[in-house]
Amino acid sequence: MEEEVAALVIDNGSGMCKAGFAGDDAPRAVFPSIVGRPRHHGIMIGMGQKDSYVGDEAQSKRGILTLRYPIEHGVVTNWDDMEKIWHHTFYNELRVAPEEHPVLLTEAPINPKSNREKMTQIVFETFNAPAFYVSIQAVLSLYASGRTTGIVLDSGDGVTHVVPIYEGFSLPHAIARVDMAGRDLTDYLMKILAERGYTFSTTAEREIVRDIKEKLCYVALDFEQEIQTASQSSSLEKSYELPDGQVITIGNERFRAPEALFQPSVLGLESGGIHVTTFNSIMKCDVDVRKDLYGNIVMSGGTTMYPGISDRMQKEITALAPSSMKVKIIAPPERKYSVWIGGSILASLSTFQQMWISKQEYDESGPSIVHRKCF
């Protein structure tokens, strides 16, 4: 028996790409899903200027580049750039030959059919992988929490999904998608900091605001109460040092920004908050499975990392649910990477090995095989 070849697991998010080997407990590579191209061509001849940069390198050279995110709201919109990101993942980050490893990719729930086919085609035709599988992100997060039934609230940088899952299958009619996630909260924080007199406008400055958000923001258990506390004392204020050494102070912005998750109306959005969306999704499911869903509400993705979010969610859902219902929020500490971790678990299961689409099957049936083998 030759040595088992590890499968490659790649979770392509709107904001960050997480990649690594099946069986590992964390991704080896985490980098921004960005492709940057020089704004001006060939000013410095012989400077070895590349025509495109990916990930951290694009981020560090952002001053001279135009940055683009090929994944918007969880769905791939630019395939040329997406191919560059995968190329970078295989050859520069993981340093592997894709033609030697099975590849597991993740996709957003309710991803258009044509997108899955295009993904399949690129993996087999451009990268010559021996085998391929595509899995729904929320389902992988649920596996990572050790469950096969539950409702997943997956909120990343570009999109938020609520996905009820029963015995390993998502229930498509009850899936909800909200185009509000980390990127929108960063924008909102930029806006309310501007009202305090701190203006951040360029794409480079936006990254600073994202850092402020990740380090200092939290979700209030009682928003009105917290606003009152903040106005009466400086106990909630925190200071932050900007890259140039200037120190700024932020107060109620710390909890006003993430409050948009529960009150999207502050962003001018019509959708209900994440608690209402979750409740509505449960109500669209069969009455017999609701108890299992209320008792297994699983948080996943970077935008669920705010301190206080679980307690607030518990409070809000309990208020909406039938009075005797047991509501349980599961927020694993590693939830930022739980989609990837679920993929790592799935791809290393012995029972999963017959699930892969092989190169041979692809050659015989073409890209549409993905709909028959991956669900």
From Swiss-Prot:
CDD domains: ASKHA_NBD_actin. SUPFAM superfamilies: Actin-like ATPase domain. Its EC number is 3.6.4.-. SMART domains: ACTIN (SM00268). GO terms for cellular component: cytoplasm; cytoskeleton. It catalyses: ATP + H2O = ADP + phosphate + H(+). One of its GO terms (molecular function) is ATP binding. Actins are highly conserved proteins that are involved in various types of cell motility and are ubiquitously expressed in all eukaryotic cells. Belongs to the actin family. This is Actin. It comes from Botryotinia fuckeliana. The gene is actA.
